[in-house]
Amino acid sequence: NKLLISSLVVATTCGLTACSDSNNPNPAPETEMPAEYYVGGKLGTTFNNTASAYEQFTEAVDNQGLVASFKRGERIFESPFDIDAQSETPMRGLGPLWVRESCIACHPGYGHGARQNNYNSNTIGNGYLLVLTDENDTYLSSLTGMPQTGSSAPFKAPIDERKIQIKWLPYTDEWNNTFPDGESYSLIYPEVTIPQDAFYVPLQVGGVDIDYSQLRVRLENTIGIYGTGLLDAISDDDIRAQYRAEEAAGVSLNPGIWANGDFVSYYTNNVQGDGTKYVRRYTYALSRGSIQDGPGANAIWNITNVTRSDRRYHYMTAAYAKVASKDPDVQAQFYKYYPAMNKTGNVETDIYNYLMSN
């Protein structure tokens, strides 16, 4: 009976709502919300409280008439790309090498990646990216900044991800894993090993071979998409002041980014941008400086290696192109998969030129 009464009340309420006048000639004026309601600022706050709120556009997007653009970007973000190059395939152009087949694979629900026990790039929610450097923390030049483990025929992946090992080990911190009130907690950290035979390319820094013993491997995990744009609201002066404070305190800072009280280098883009200098503030490697040309705007293309009309080049290293162009297995099948690339009759040259977008 209680269920029946509740159902009747809900039905009656819905009926009354449906009969209300939706064309009120004297609508109540919109009231400005208190400042504390805009936790993400007026441009970054949504009042959508559904289960998918973090995937929705904000009020500012709607007010500027940008919902259609948001939806187009959402489709690119959420859809896996295909290696099929036929014009009727909507999400085509994956490869020839890639980090992931889609953006959402690393950002499920637009959030961060989940902890993994192995490096399988096809696992939805695996937001791990490899960070490969020498013992001086200099990135390997023979691999892309975000190393690729996927490939389409006839090419071979730069790293065989099946051989990557991830072990989670216990860790004891400086407080002996104990809160001030005596309660204890446990910590773990990943130990990542990539055997030497997993690499298809030589290990190089600045184009010079290094010994395998010099290799350092770290894991970088994705962060949630929502809220990251607020980093753009931090002024350059505030970032500069933070660097100066840390330098004065004796903190070891990257000399390639900061030295003697100021930035050594800035982020610029002379290809899709106008060459404006930006303070580096995005990505693990501080390789981006503006939200309009930030990690997401570039990763959509770098992660999948999809090209576009104003970005006609592959996310690729010359070291990989050189190795692949000399690989007999690749040479034997290249014209089968890429007949239009038979431009010189020299298969080694054609492979190299294709990969390097020459």
How would you name each of these model-derived features?
Residues 28-57, 70, 74:
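N-terminal regions that are enriched for targeting/export leaders
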Residues 48-49, 53-69, 78-358:
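Extracytoplasmic redox metalloprotein regions
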